[in-house]
Each structure stands twice: as structure tokens, then as C-alpha cells.
């Protein structure tokens, strides 16, 4: 789809659809000087820029049929070739989402019936399919799709689960979701489930379950990326001991710089680096107030684990506000510009902006 066609699409969607998507702090972030913007664009042509964790247009919860084209355009403006589009499948337990018929499911809802979490997940995966069918984005099934998207000025959506609650303890559900395009699985979100234990309060001790271990093995066999975000330390250690592939911790902060529960310790940074994996730093304005602080977090991971083991996971539309300078319009270029201003080379900036993620994906996919 040409960029000139996008304004017509925006108008055709109408204001109602846009109003259904939270747009807090919808600023464009830090302004990028023209010369710096040109340099970043050159870097994007030799590295795959990727958002390791996002909920574009809040497609998993909001009353939208697709990811909205203006959201895709925000990514395109920052030269992002890949967006990992996450479905928080534990929302079937917590509520706070909108059904196809427009009804709102409130917080603290009833326990889902058997098959209900899987059905909700399939419906949200269909929203990604519909986004692609509408021509707003392309599909990211294999790493070559990202290279093609970059070459064509497009954005590729990679289908992901945030919390593997959709499996409902069934490996057959995993196989079915993989058949439908699932390429990344995050075992845990905001509840303990059939796979393991969560990171956030109230902290629950315990690691991977036997089913969780089986899912890790099958993910390795199928070429599905494993994301350890939201898993507690025991579950992370169990995954790292078992997996044969590099893994992600797609979005969060670092313990050394904040007393928070959505962080990795220096020991965990080193273990993930030894595994060949990548830690994604997020621009969550409630916890990482400014873009400068976000880049401080990135630099800490570089010092502890190395330049090859850090990336960006925006959690776009999954948080209420964004780091000042990054902005609600997801100005990834501002991160690249700050790294360049701090003296990082073009190659190193390309790694942080998505090259490291692309390496992990290529390894996991066997390409």
C-alpha cells in the first residue's frame, strides 16, 4: 500500500474506531534533526529494526477489527520492519476487553469456560490476519519476511502470546496456534498458569511445571521464540537450563537502576547473554520517566551483558503513558538518535534497534 493512500484510509475508518483505542500522551516524542534522521534511515537499511513487544492499536482488548493504519504508519515513520504483536490471553480471566459485538467485559469477571481462552485468542489472531488482508501490514512468519518488509518499506506483524493461558494445558492448542501463525510464546503474564509462575506481586515461588517444560521443548522444535518477560526468577532459570535456543526478556527494566518488580537482575542479564538472548528495555513512562533514562537502562545492559544482548520492547498500548521523549506515537528514532549522540557506532545502534532480535529469531527459526 502506498503512503499516499493512507490518509484516505484514515478518513474512511472514521473517528469512532480511533476513539476506541487509548491514546494517552499521543505526542511524537523528541524532534530529530534532519541530518540525524538521514543517518538513522541509512542504519535501518542494513539492520532490521524491530519492536520486540507491543499491542498495536490495543487490538487484543479494544473494539477494533484490525490494527489501525495510522498505528502502522507510526512504525513506518521510525523504519520499524517488524512488530511483535502480542495477545494477552490471561485477559479472559481479568476482563477489561471489548467483544466483537461491542459489549465490554469488566474487570474481575467469571472463570472462563473450557475452550473460551483459546477461542478468544483465535479471534485476536484473526484481527491480525484481517490487518494483513486489508493491506495495512504484512505477515512475519519467517525472518525473510522481515527483510522483504524492510526492502519494500512495509511493516511485518509477528503473532505472539503474552501469557500462554490460551493453551489451557493442551499441547494440541499450541500446535493449532502455531498452524495459525504463532511465532513467539511468552509463558507467563499476570497470573500463574499451567506453565509456570509470574514475576509481579504477589510473588509466587516455583518454576516451570512439567507442562511448561514440555512447551519449551516443543517451542524449540517448532522454531517458536520463547519470551521470559513476566516470569519469576525460578521460571526464568528453568527455561534457560532447558532451552536449546536463545530467548528473550522482551520488555522491562533493570534492577540496578530501579526498585521495581518488572526488571532483570545483573545475574539474569548475564545468564540471558550467555544463552545468546536479548533483553528489551521499555519506554513505560510510569516506571522509566524519560527517554534519557530509557537509554541509561540500555547502556546498563550493554555494560553487564554486551551490545549483542539488548533491544527495545515498547509495550505500545499496553501501558498508560510513555517515556518523555519517546512519546505516544512511538518515536523509536529518538532512541537511535540518543544512542548516536552518546557515541555508539551505526552498527551498534542497528543491533539495539532490532538487529539483536533478528539474530535470535533467525537462530530459532533455523535460518
Question: Which role does the model predict for each range below?
Answer:
Residues 165-168, 179-263:
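Divalent metal-binding pocket/active-site signature
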Residues 19-203, 259-312, 316-367:
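N-terminal hydrophobic targeting/anchoring segments and the immediately downstream early-domain regions
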Residues 7-16:
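Bacterial N-terminal signal peptides
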